[in-house]
């Protein structure tokens, strides 16, 4: 047996096929993160959504209270004073026509793209490049705004966008495996609360189907969703 497959087998053997309480699950997540890099902590949440209907789609943003653990590179499409404001607020890139042309040529050295409303006609042509990567600015995600300073500060602090995919599953990173269990729990609570708060109007009956967490290279660990609702973590 190779070293890699032996490692994976040993890690998987630590996980039982049952719903875990949050603190035990997060300790297991950290314990099973054995890759040679700092792994992300991921949540995969299956919801009872039929996303072909507009009133059963979920797409929104939230700010993780303990941040993402990732340095976010932000690009801003704006002109004049707004471009200067963006750089002063911590944007890594800022420009208008020149930046749009660079993106058209394949320059995607950023994690988030913000645009001022007057730039929307200019970036419409970027849909085919940015859309599949989830980088296209939109008012709903807070990435089309005149207040570029606040937007940059929020994303740098840990604001992220998430959506339910075609199968009704939300895939979201809620920190890094070198975070404390308490910090991971606070971030995971924020995820759960955001999903409940933004429950689509068309959903009837049971909303949550399953709730799993894992590290980037680790096994899935099932969580007991009722514990989050009761806020009684032990």
UniProtKB/Swiss-Prot annotation:
Stored Gene3D superfamilies: 3.30.190.20, 3.40.50.790
Official protein name in the record: Large ribosomal subunit protein uL1c
Gene Ontology BP annotations: translation
Protein keywords: Chloroplast, Plastid, Ribonucleoprotein, Ribosomal protein, RNA-binding, rRNA-binding
Gene this chain is encoded by: rpl1
A single cellular component GO annotation: large ribosomal subunit
Localization: Plastid, Chloroplast
One Pfam family recorded for the sequence: Ribosomal_L1
Phylogenetic placement of the source organism: Eukaryota, Cryptophyceae, Pyrenomonadales, Geminigeraceae, Guillardia
Natural source organism: Guillardia theta
